[in-house]
A protein has these predicted regions:
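Catalytic domains of riboflavin
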Residues: 1-377
Length: 377
């Protein structure tokens, strides 16, 4: 497949190289970081591999790990309030204590530290903090949740049949500037490396995996009129997400769409009881004016199993439900889950109802979603 008309390798080819202990280059969306990273599996780490990454990558060598592994090693987030643009989930940096390690910065020491991060008998106290290796917490669900190099690294290792952990480093040009796609292609040729895109990795995984399962599908009467409600349960954490749609469309049609960052539990109940946030009320009105469209409620609650029970009551009572539920603080929208829901709704082109154009665009093309227009409201 190609990226900006440049021929890239297939995901299958990259998986085979990761399995063989080789380095691959992974590029992301030009609307995101527009960078390339050297990526390898942690299980295949050697001092020589670290030296190659440090010498020819020139960026910061990091070790993407699963949330589960980070908890096992007591690797807490580096900061309590992550304000970096794409919320890369750095933990406190580490060095392996002892085992022949001294300063922690040599390629030997860094390779040993990465080995320790995936060894089952490594204990939290075996790791000195801070150190010279920077673990990254990958989102559960991988690139289907977040189109980042962190998730791509863990996904590729897992797809190669290895432990879900890896090594990455950003690739810089010799003058210290970021290497963009044309330079990355030359780097790949020079070192005979495979080069793939996160966009293609997402497409590969969407063909083979799904993070959602439809649990409910029925017509519902709201104060904004009749809508079709679909409830989806996320298999990584059992959260329940809601899609409310009006009208019909074909697969090539750009559909008016709002991806809502508030909580599904509260939003759907407030839609029925008349206590809905004014911005979402405006979205309903826009869709009614259009005659068709979709509103997604991406649930941010830790536990949302009760939502399916509540929706069952809503269905049985024709939408006559008045429950007073507490408001919870929402995190950023989960566009990976939203993308899978949109694909299930036969939506690939959207007219996005939004107030902040730039942040909505980040990473979206990786999910094969084309934003044809931004509708301000």
């Amino acid at each position: 497949m190609s990226h900006n008309h440049i021929q890239l390798n297939t995901i299958e080819e990259a998986i085979e190289d990761i399995k063989a202990g080789k380095v691959v280059i992974v590029v992301d969306d030009e609307d995101r970081e527009n960078e390339g990273d050297f990526i390898a599996a942690a299980e295949k780490v050697t001092p020589e591999l670290i030296n190659f990454m440090a010498t020819h990558g020139r960026g910061l060598i990091c070790a993407p790990l699963t949330q589960k592994r980070c908890k096992e090693l007591n690797l807490h987030p580096m900061v309590t309030n992550n304000t970096v643009l794409h919320q890369t989930a750095f933990t406190v940096s580490v060095d392996l204590i002892g085992n022949g390690c001294t300063t922690g910065i040599s390629v030997h020491d860094r390779a040993k530290t990465i080995e320790a991060l995936i060894k089952e008998d490594t204990k939290p106290e075996d790791l000195g903090r801070p150190g010279h290796i920077f673990p990254l917490i990958a989102k559960e669900g991988g690139v289907l949740r977040r189109t980042g190099h962190t998730e791509a690294t863990v996904d590729l290792a897992r797809l190669a049949g290895l432990k879900p952990a890896g090594i990455l480093v950003e690739i810089l040009n010799e003058d210290g500037t970021m290497a963009r796609l044309p330079q990355l292609v030359e780097v790949a040729k020079k070192w005979d490396l495979k080069i793939i895109s996160i966009e293609n990795l997402v497409a590969y995984r969407m063909k083979h995996d799904s993070l959602i399962e439809k649990k409910e599908d029925f017509e519902i009467d709201t104060r904004f009129g009749k809508f079709r409600l679909r409830a989806y349960q996320q298999n990584t954490n059992k959260q329940v997400h809601i899609a409310l749609t009006k009208g019909d469309w074909n697969s090539n049609e750009a559909v008016l769409t709002r991806i809502n960052s508030m909580l599904g539990n509260n939003d759907i109940l407030d839609a029925l009881s008349g206590k809905l946030d004014i911005r979402i009320e405006a979205a309903f009105n826009k869709i009614n004016e259009e005659g068709k469209g979709a509103i997604l409620f991406i649930n941010q609650e830790e536990v949302s199993s009760s939502l399916l029970k509540r929706l069952s009551i809503v269905k049985e009572n024709d939408g006559k439900l008045d429950l007073d539920t507490p408001k919870l603080t929402a995190d950023q929208k989960d566009y990976g889950i939203g993308a899978q829901i949109l694909h299930d709704l036969n939506i690939s082109k959207i007219k996005l109802l939004t107030n902040s154009e730039k942040t909505k665009r980040v990473g979206m093309t990786g999910y094969n979603l084309e934003i044809e227009d931004y509708i301000q409201y």
